[in-house]
A protein has these predicted regions:
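PLP-dependent aspartate aminotransferase-fold enzymes
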Residues: 88-102, 106-202, 206-207
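N-terminal entrance/gating region of PLP-dependent enzymes' catalytic architecture
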Residues: 16, 39-124, 130
């Protein structure tokens, strides 16, 4: 618990004091805080009961209490998937990056891109994405897979010369990816056609801005998307392939399949869930001037 000396320190240094409050209330014409609140806050949103707040605690006591609460958690295995996979972070990364104070100290030397090796790190990241996807260029980078896919759709819209308002999205994409594309395209009045690419693409008889396919699908199935990519191109659309980068170590690259833009989350490579996900759209070189920059 907090001792009397600490309470005195709090009273002196954390205001406003009771005297300050009295002066301020007198200035605005109210007798008490309750009088002020009743005349400024609508009654219907006021709490009827007093807040149940325990006595103040020191930092150590608070940490002990939080740890005791956390021990009540039950830890289960995670089988959710859908773009989020638990992974083991290699010790070399933990030791040399996450535990290296040079990355998070308050003082940053001049030209941190050189002094801390950031430019080299980003260059290596981009080259790895290019190697895995087979694309000509890669950025470094965006946020999660859903955001990167929405950016790829935006890139396709900027490149579109058909004035189309239609976008095809495979129902095999992760649900959060589909939802984010809906949110980002709604202000532009674009029409989303969501369904099985093997059935729905052939029914579209007009130009589309782009088609978004998942490789592998959200449930893990691996299908050859080359025929669907060909159909998207016949409708003058850009083929966007949402990839599992780890799977691309064994599967055909998006470039070999004919995709125009590839996106995928790097969370698979030892990044704990809950951290920033670095995701890179890797379009053909001719689209480079229109692609989104790093975020």
């Amino acid at each position: 618990m907090i001792d009397d000396n600490s309470k005195e320190f709090i009273k002196r240094h954390i205001g406003p004091s009771e005297e300050d409050q009295s002066k301020m209330l007198q200035y605005v014409g109210y007798k008490s805080l309750e009088d002020l609140m009743s005349n400024t806050v609508p009654e219907k949103i006021l709490l009827k009961d007093d807040l149940k707040i325990d006595q103040p605690m020191s930092e150590n006591d608070a940490l002990k209490k939080l740890k005791s609460i956390s021990k009540k958690n039950k830890i289960f295995k995670n089988f959710i998937g859908m773009g989020y996979y638990n992974s083991i972070t290699p010790n070399v990364i933990l030791r040399n990056i996450l535990e290296n104070p040079g990355w998070y100290t308050s003082y940053t030397p001049y030209q941190p891109e050189v002094a801390q090796g950031r430019l080299e790190m980003l260059l290596n990241f981009q080259q790895s994405i290019i190697d895995l996807t087979g694309m000509d260029i890669a950025n470094a980078s965006l946020l999660d897979e859903a955001t990167a896919t929405a950016e790829a759709v935006g890139l396709s819209q900027r490149l579109d010369k058909t004035n189309s308002k239609k976008i095809f999205i495979s129902s095999n994409c992760n649900p959060q990816t589909i939802d984010l594309i809906k949110t980002r395209t709604n202000p532009f009045g674009l029409e989303l056609i969501i369904g099985d690419e093997k059935k729905e693409l052939s029914k579209i008889n007009e130009d589309i801005i782009c088609g978004v396919l998942s490789y592998p699908g959200t449930l893990g199935e691996i299908n050859d998307p080359s025929e669907s990519i060909s159909q998207i191109h016949k409708k003058n659309g850009k083929a966007i392939l949402v990839c599992d980068l780890l799977a691309l170590a064994r599967l055909k690259t998006p470039a070999e399949l004919g995709a125009d833009i590839a996106v995928g989350s790097a969370q698979r490579f030892g990044i704990p869930m809950g951290c920033l996900l670095y995701t890179s759209p890797s379009p053909r070189d001719r689209y480079g001037s229109r692609m989104p920059s790093s975020a």
